[in-house]
Amino acid sequence: PYICSEWEFGGLPAWLLRDRNMRLRCSYEPYLNAVKEYYSVLIPKLVPHQCDRGGGVILVQLENEYGYYGNDTAYLEFLRDTLRELGVTVPFVTSDGPWSEPKFKSGMLNGALPTGNLGSGAEWQFGQMRKYIGENKPLMCMEFWNGWFDAWGEEQHTTSPEKAASELDELLKRGSVNFYMFEGGTNFGFMSGRNGGSKTGDVTSYDYDAPLTEDGQITEKYRLFKEVIAKYTDIHEIPLTTEIRRRAYGRISCTGKTDLFSVLDKISVPVKSSYPLTMEDIGQDYGYILYRMKIRDIETVSEIRLEGAADRVQCYHNGEFVYTAFAAVSYTHLRAHETLMN
């Protein structure tokens, strides 16, 4: 159920957090019940498309890098058994980072092939995996990181096509490979997530510097990958006839505008509380919340500090925009009876 992928909440629905006792990705019964209900709708749609029935689904991954998160084997067993009950017959896999033996082994499970996620150092990392899984199982890189994602305020990540092709060659000498990513994508709307430890969220584009760009353009990385793969298997030439069109839309003239504070009563309903409410408290999964407070009974406030914001914060003082931040925000010389909004 958890996919990471820099997708909002790793693909888990926000409403799970309305349970103040919620424990994710473990044997917490309300979480397992939600997973089972979700799978009961999703899996029957996938079962007919498994490769043993003429379809394209060749493997099913139980979790995603679970060894980094926990070691609840009973939870992984629940996923495995539930999927089997619902008709999954193709092999199961797990995926973790080979560079950490404890974390890799925490994600392993009987009845599932352990695979590794990596972007370089195939000889050493596959060597580590061989120690963990023994001599009789195939080696596979489930996520070959041939690029990387971008966060707001950072430089765009790119990787050398030549170096990426060399890493691919080293992987194919030793085992099997699944590209992450083969084609770049887009996390529209509020669906882009945030990497653990990062101060800013990820951008809408998930181009990833992949072999095929976000809009399907062929890159030098694609051409070099094709040459490497041709060393290990026959590649049939396919004419690439689809024209990928790009267009410059030029300037757009804005003929009218309004501001948030003049239309608040038309787009939302106020909720009053003596303390800040979370999005889960008011049943809002996505979008924005406007928090407002008045500073009272103090002649002068030298500084107000906002701490612990879990996401992007835009702050206004008396209706005027002040600051955007992802961390602590400070204000100086705010006087009594003035309104602070964020």
Which residues does each PLM region occupy?
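Aromatic-lined ligand-binding clefts that engage carbohydrates, nucleic acids, or primary amines
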Residues: 301-317
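Conserved small/polar residues in nucleotide/adenosyl-binding loops
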Residues: 332-339
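Extended carbohydrate-recognition surfaces in non-catalytic/accessory domains of CAZymes
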Residues: 194, 206, 217-220, 227-302
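A cross-kingdom feature marking solvent-exposed beta-strand/loop segments within repeated
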Residues: 316, 321-331
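The substrate-binding groove and active-site-proximal loops of carbohydrate-active enzymes
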Residues: 19-35, 62-71, 117-118, 147-161, ...
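Active-site mouth of glycoside hydrolases
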Residues: 1-89
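Catalytic-core region of carbohydrate-active enzymes that cleave or remodel glycosidic bonds
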Residues: 121-211
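Substrate-binding cleft/loops of secretory-pathway carbohydrate-active enzymes
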Residues: 68-82, 88, 97-129, 189-193
